[in-house]
Amino acid sequence: MADVLTELPGVGPSTAEKLIEAGYLDFMKIATSTIGELTDIEGISEKAAAKMIMAARDLCDLGFKSGVELLRQRQSVWRLSTGSKELDTVLAGGLESQSVTEFAGMYGSGKTQIMHQSCVNLQIAGKIYADLEGVVEEELENPKAVYIDTEGTFRPERVVQMAEGLGIDGQLVLDNTFVARAYNSDMQMLFAEKIEDLIKSGNNIKLVIIDSLTSTFRNEFTGRGKLAERQQKLGRHMATLNKLADLYNCIVLVTNQVAAKPDAFFGVAEQAIGGHVVGHAATFRFFLRKSKGDKRVAKLYDSPHLPDSEAVFRITEKGIMD
């Protein structure tokens, strides 16, 4: 691996080892990095970092693409069922890869339940997708999920319960789900950055979950004086998640807390935390709210190509369903 990186200008065996230790295992990771990120590595100057990045981009053939090429790339997008056909219809078939989907809402609105259900559904992605579309899809090869838990709400027993509700082995789902408990924003960001290491070591990571996205940031950066610092750090975290979705054709799901809108006289009285940073970085944005009994309402209010729409789903012992 070190021999490959030495093809870059100014990279000898010693520098190559430092790059590998920092997680830069291939040209693509270097090509999509910033000068500031590379200069954090001891012994790499801004000038050397700039040369490495430019050379890596040339080797990866990064640049403009035609609309036809992008359309071809979009054909590799796959979808994962939420468990609710009505909600899947709003999403034109299910949760989409190469994108970040946000579910925001008050406590008890179903955010974490959707995250748990997604881990289960990943193990039968091909089967569920075939049921929805009426066509036979090639099943994912031993897909795995990463669940970064920032609020201590991941429950393996709930995953098993949902799996049994679909007639599959709950132990299989747990075996294929990597869970990390993040107690602060630095841990949260580090775990997200380490996902590439899991992929490089042979794990077919196809689902990444952050539950929840903003809780650690809210706890650490209090007051308006720290808002700019919080947003910059959150922006870097979202960039990491988007890069994972794009480079590895995986689905990224994030839950988000809400805050009251004091100026809201009509309509939704809460707004998702994170402001424009999260708003611009998330591909699909949902707002969840409680309804009667076990019913929940999911409103899609931001998407690059789908209309605003609502779906009603239920949270039962067996999991998410219509």
UniProtKB/Swiss-Prot annotation:
UniProt KW keywords: ATP-binding, DNA damage, DNA recombination, DNA-binding, Nucleotide-binding
Binding site for ATP: 105-112
SUPFAM superfamilies documented for this protein: P-loop containing nucleoside triphosphate hydrolases, Rad51 N-terminal domain-like
InterPro entries per UniProt: AAA+_ATPase, DNA_recomb/repair_Rad51_C, DNA_recomb/repair_RadA, DNA_recomb/repair_RecA-like, DNA_repair_Rad51/TF_NusA_a-hlx, Hlx-hairpin-Hlx_DNA-bd_motif, P-loop_NTPase, RecA_ATP-bd
GO biological process, one term: DNA recombination
Gene Ontology terms for molecular function: ATP binding; ATP hydrolysis activity; ATP-dependent DNA damage sensor activity; damaged DNA binding
PROSITE patterns the UniProt entry points to: RECA_2 (PS50162), RECA_3 (PS50163)
Function summary: Involved in DNA repair and in homologous recombination. Binds and assemble on single-stranded DNA to form a nucleoprotein filament. Hydrolyzes ATP in a ssDNA-dependent manner and promotes DNA strand exchange between homologous DNA molecules.
Similarity annotation: Belongs to the eukaryotic RecA-like protein family.
Protein name: DNA repair and recombination protein RadA
Native organism: Methanococcus maripaludis (strain C6 / ATCC BAA-1332)
